[in-house]
Design a protein with these regions (language model features):
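A glycine/proline-hinged amphipathic helix-loop "lid/cap" segment
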Residues: 2-110
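Short, low-complexity Ser/Thr-rich regulatory SLiMs
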Residues: 109-114, 159
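A structural signal for the main folded, soluble domain(s) of proteins
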Residues: 111-113, 121, 203, 217
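Short beta-strand element of the alpha/beta-hydrolase
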Residues: 118-128
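Catalytic nucleophile-loop/oxyanion-hole region of alpha/beta-hydrolase
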Residues: 133-134, 140, 153-194
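A short, Lys/Arg-enriched amphipathic alpha-helix followed by its capping loop at the start of a domain
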Residues: 143-150
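Primarily recognizes the serine-hydrolase "nucleophile elbow" in alpha/beta-hydrolase
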Residues: 174-220
Length: 220
């Protein structure tokens, strides 16, 4: 058997065992919602409010896209980022915002009045990996702090195309490790009583990727 044929056979064997290994890992299927169950408002009034809000956001985003569609792509990205950050700029929130350096990642603590800061939630915003920030999601993170009775750490992870997607995951890891040792009140030598990771859209994708990283590296 020639050296080239042996190399091909060896490569196929490696791929075969790699596939078997990946298929044998925990799929996290036990965390899925029951078939047919949707995460969202259930009553008619809330569904209508949600529908109108989404329509208003889409209209504003499309208007911005049309207005700047002739710009070079890099300039258009900057405009879309500014537009997204300004979506809820006039909205009132009840939470306190505290800017921090979370292990080298710019972030902000979002803490609703009276929440238990030993309960911490890492929030990873959406925005197609190239837009969004803690500022664009403050209405959401403030409400999350309220309903989960926890301090929310919203991170400003590095975005594409200036950075690679793996940089996004690295920022999630660094800020998560920092969050385990810090609270809105400063360095915390006590382990948090509860830890959550959540995100929307691209942030939801990063959440799943990061949770698998935690699982494979035996992190909390």
């Amino acid at each position: 058997m020639s050296l080239a044929v042996s190399a091909v056979c060896f490569f196929i064997l490696i791929v075969f065992w790699a596939v078997l290994y990946l298929l044998s890992r925990d799929t996290l299927a036990h965390l899925d919602l029951p078939a047919g169950q949707l995460f969202g408002p259930q009553d008619a009034e809330s569904k209508e409010i949600s529908k109108l809000a989404v329509a208003a956001l889409n209209k504003r985003l499309r208007a911005s896209a049309v207005k700047h569609e002739k710009l070079p792509w890099k300039e258009r990205v900057l405009v879309l980022r500014e537009t997204m950050d300004s979506f809820f700029s006039g909205a009132e929130i009840v939470s306190t915002l505290t800017a921090v350096d979370a292990g080298g990642v710019l972030a902000e603590w979002v803490t609703a009045p009276g929440v238990d800061v030993s309960r911490r939630l890492l929030y990873i915003h959406g925005g197609a990996f190239f837009a969004g920030s803690p500022k664009s999601h403050r209405v959401l993170t403030s409400k999350l702090s309220e309903i989960t009775n926890s301090a929310v750490l919203a991170i400003d992870y590095r975005l594409t195309p200036e950075h690679s997607r793996i940089a996004c995951v690295d920022d999630c890891r660094a800020s998560y490790d920092w969050m385990l040792k810090n609270s809105p009140e400063g360095v915390d030598n006590l382990a948090p009583t509860a830890v959550f990771v959540a995100g929307d859209s691209a942030g939801g994708n990063l959440t799943l990727s990061f949770l698998n990283l935690i699982r494979d590296n035996t992190r909390r």
